[in-house]
From Swiss-Prot:
Annotated S-S bridges: C150-C164
Functional description taken from the UniProt entry: After binding acetylcholine, the AChR responds by an extensive change in conformation that affects all subunits and leads to opening of an ion-conducting channel across the plasma membrane.
GO biological process: regulation of membrane potential
Segments traversing the membrane: 241-265, 274-292, 308-329, 477-497
Cytoplasmic side: 330-476
Annotated membrane topology: Multi-pass membrane protein
Record's protein name: Acetylcholine receptor subunit gamma
Signal peptide boundaries: 1-22
Lineage: Eukaryota, Metazoa, Chordata, Craniata, Vertebrata
CDD domains, A to Z: LGIC_ECD_nAChR_G, LGIC_TM_nAChR
Source organism of this protein record: Mus musculus (Mouse)
Gene name linked to the record: Chrng
Principal location: membrane
Catalysis: reaction(s): K(+)(in) = K(+)(out); Na(+)(in) = Na(+)(out)
Topology Extracellular: residue spans: 23-240
Amino acid sequence: MQGGQRPHLLLLLLAVCLGAQSRNQEERLLADLMRNYDPHLRPAERDSDVVNVSLKLTLTNLISLNEREEALTTNVWIEMQWCDYRLRWDPKDYEGLWILRVPSTMVWRPDIVLENNVDGVFEVALYCNVLVSPDGCIYWLPPAIFRSSCSISVTYFPFDWQNCSLIFQSQTYSTSEINLQLSQEDGQAIEWIFIDPEAFTENGEWAIRHRPAKMLLDSVAPAEEAGHQKVVFYLLIQRKPLFYVINIIAPCVLISSVAILIYFLPAKAGGQKCTVATNVLLAQTVFLFLVAKKVPETSQAVPLISKYLTFLMVVTILIVVNSVVVLNVSLRSPHTHSMARGVRKLFLRLLPQLLRMHVRPLAPAAVQDARFRLQNGSSSGWPIMAREEGDLCLPRSELLFRQRQRNGLVQAVLEKLENGPEVRQSQEFCGSLKQASPAIQACVDACNLMARARRQQSHFDSGNEEWLLVGRVLDRVCFLAMLSLFICGTAGIFLMAHYNQVPDLPFPGDPRPYLPLPD
């Protein structure tokens, strides 16, 4: 068993010796390179030399976009490359060592920071090691979580898209000292934010449409002075509106539909209509408050969803007003309001035909004229004797006794009057009875009084029914008007969002797509 362990021990000792020798070579190389090395000095052999620094941004996660704070949070890797002539070596002198890992704090860095941060964190999250090659070129890939400012346009919220950017520049060096440029691959500048499909995490609220990158020169610097270069990485992102459609827009549309459906309640149920409409109005106010907590507090624009909720509130208020007006019309009576001929013709003849509503046909003109005379208390044309109603107020026993005597006559008279005789026939019939005995004349007076009271009550009920029919027709007209307004307003507002799309190209007038060429 000891003989079987010897080969393993020899291999282990050989690996330790080789590792120690390789480590010793790295230590020796690092010591040689760091001898008289000052990380605070720019790696330029002459003062007029410019150090080229290339940048590449790799996006691994678009964490969030806070609309109220107007802050974009991203998880990125910043790839920076530059050359330092003081870190060159010959691999032959160090047993073929081609890569040296050096702590980033020990070498010169171009001080690239995020200019438009919102939390005061300008630098990267981890100062990882840099990779140094024999020609002195340095490769540094630090990770970072940045919170950058992003101006939010709330005009089409939640069907909006935003143009956010990450602006990088050197904190201490100008264009006469370093030259910022985009990294190149196969001779082509990487003018876009690189996304590794295997490492990238999709955001649930935002979809990336364009991700170009551009070099900009600080325009605020005087002409005689050197300005600062900026590398700007743009993110054109479009919101996924499904969350807001399901949780805000769809409930609002359904609740507002309930407000429209109150027109199917009877015209006299104005109190119930106002109660339902008021509850809908309160629910819409709650949704408007929820939207106000989401968007930035700005007066530059009104969000599309706020416009829609305000529109729904206006429609609901109009429904309440309509309900009050219809209730006022439905409760009118002939004693308080006289219906004009134009109102009767419009609401009881023309509009019901147009709306295909079933309305009871109007009474003949002669009966209408008789109702008019009854309403005004006129007895001309009716053979009623000049007897006060108080003369008929006899004791109950006497009335019952007389009633039994003239039961047949009264019944015949009532049948004549209830069967709706012609006015002329009624006059002839009652005129023939005037020559009868005083008892019959008293019976005629009583019958005429009862008939007049019944006709007046019938006319009163008919007048109430007419006003109720006017209320029904007006209610139907308001229903069609509010339904049309609701449908047209909803379609018009959301069609505005349909035409708010991300442009096909990231920069207007620039035909380049700022994307890698297809293979």
